[in-house]
Amino acid sequence: MTLDLVLVCPGCRTRTPERLDVKTLERTGDLLVCECGRQYPIIDGVPIVFADPAEYLRGEIATIVERDLSPAVAALLVAAGPDDAPYPRLLEHLSIYLDAQWGDRAQPRADGAGFALEAVIARLAALPHVGAAVELGCSVGRVLAELAVHAEHVVGVDLQFGALRRARRLLDGERVAFARRISGRHYAPAEIEAGDRVVPAARRQIVCGDALDPPLIPAIYDRVVALNVLDSIARPRQLLAVLDGLCAPGGELILTSPFAWQSSVMHEHERFGGADPAADLAAILTTGDGLGARYQIEDSAELPWTLRRDARSVLSYRTHYVRARRT
């Protein structure tokens, strides 16, 4: 398998009871092209591949055409607000997740809570080497970098283009400057380098796409990862089915979630597990309910997960970790 072949056209993908038909995308300049005629843009090294790319582009054009501004200029642009405008929202999102994922490699280090992945990375570091790993919800790319330590090829999918631009640059070995939120719309400059977590482009692919409809060839990934995505997506049961569909025979799923269900994200009937969603998740995996296979739970734990919003505000979760083998 080469990474040139892992992206498929979601627009013409067809499924019947007997088979799934997919067409791979070929690169032509700054486009990925399908023989069906559909085309998908590659911007700053990141392909944007959705079944309806026009709808995504209309809603996210501000983050797609965003320039690399110095932290001082970026902070000045958002100072007047409002908070819910696209660029202030992007700047806040990047501040939170760059520190959460790369805070141990940031200069200066964040005051208070910063790096949030220590417990997860320790578990990933103990896993055996595999051929291919995929992460849905890869954000700014740190877990993708850790997966690459124990995988020949890694693929990351996320909906947030601004985060993926930073992931691509960090994994390429570039120094990324960002604005770290101090209070309200006030920011201070910081920067990150991946160091020994650089991942050569020949070994990885980053794509802007829908985790519920990823443009990926099914059933080829030995390690399938989705960290803190389950309760951040409209259809968590569908996400489990997608993860199962990507998993190769004998492969493993790695999931974390604090199960912080929100009505603004999903309908009430999409929630599962009542007072003990971790037990319900284990039951879904071990029985194969709604999936194409059953899974054996090989590891589970309750891990800390903190997100620094600014110098005075931290979101703290206890996230459930589970690693399960396809049987």
Where are these regions (language model features)?
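Conserved alpha-helix/loop element of class I SAM-dependent methyltransferases that forms part
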Residues: I96-G131
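Conserved SAM-binding loop of SAM-dependent methyltransferases across substrates and taxa
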Residues: V140-H150
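Conserved SAM/SAH-binding beta-strand->alpha-helix loop
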Residues: Q160
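S-adenosyl-L-methionine
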Residues: L171-L212
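Conserved Class I S-adenosyl-L-methionine
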Residues: S183-G184, M266-S300
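A short acidic, Gly/Pro-enriched loop at the edge of an enzyme's catalytic core
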Residues: L212-V224
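A short glycine-rich, Lys/Arg-flanked "PGG" loop and its adjoining helix->strand segment in the class I
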Residues: R237-P249
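Conserved beta-strand signature within the Rossmann-like core of class I S-adenosyl-L-methionine
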Residues: G250-P258
